């Protein structure tokens, strides 16, 4: 055996798994198709928002939250209507995982992260607040905790731990190693086979080449697949698109780099993995094309307040709960029900100055760079620098 565990994917999930495995004394090989510059995957580009329940940040804002309320909200949003009580049902393990995660978010999650050095912006955001009755979709209270340092700040402690383990000889990071097959022996996954891609100096987030330079095979008694989803492959998205939302949009923009291609899902299924709930996807409707793109079709999500008018393609105003940040999937269906795949956001410079922000680490350099002076500058008149750049 080449290692105790092989981890496929060097994004946040892969790094967390690897760090914890190393702390448990395991030898780990991490393989990833991208170059070292992309260590951390798509999490690097995120706003760094984390779901926490009953946190000190909430209490300072006099937000009353609990595990019971969070679980009620989760049930109202997820539904879990696909045989959740049957171990063979699609929602059985989904519900079990969700309950464990809510308990984690209301329990040790914040203390664990704080112990690793993660800190939070003192203002808690209210994402997906719903707009229905209390037992319907959405968060009853604000739970969106912004990491001080955004996505890179979430990654930092795990990158540090994995690099230290690599230096100590407990981890091998093999970049430009693309897995094409999971090796199955006597019904168990015992390794990976794939292609070594040519060296690439592609910058983080930009597309790297897929030119082969060789083959590889590695073996281990355990293999963890942490390879990410299908967000950058519009054809895979369309193939899994649910009928309940209507016809998939003809034109889409992309919130993640090109390497988020979903390849390992089909590869894992071929090896015997069970894929469930493929049609339960999450697509933001408040996206606009990035004027300065990093990856193909680069889209950025607007984080607006309530004052702008949101109109369909024919100029008719959307009704409740189709407001920005309230119920993303309901709004997506409302847009597609019009027969068009776009909508209009009518606003003013004054509203933009007071209410608009953009999602993503690169669109919030003050928070990402942990610059208190720049953050305080948000209180000054006018939009933030990134918002102004979009307006210009």
Predicted segments with their positions:
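N-terminal glycine-rich dinucleotide-binding loop that anchors FAD/FMN and/or NAD(P) in oxidoreductases
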Residues: 44-75
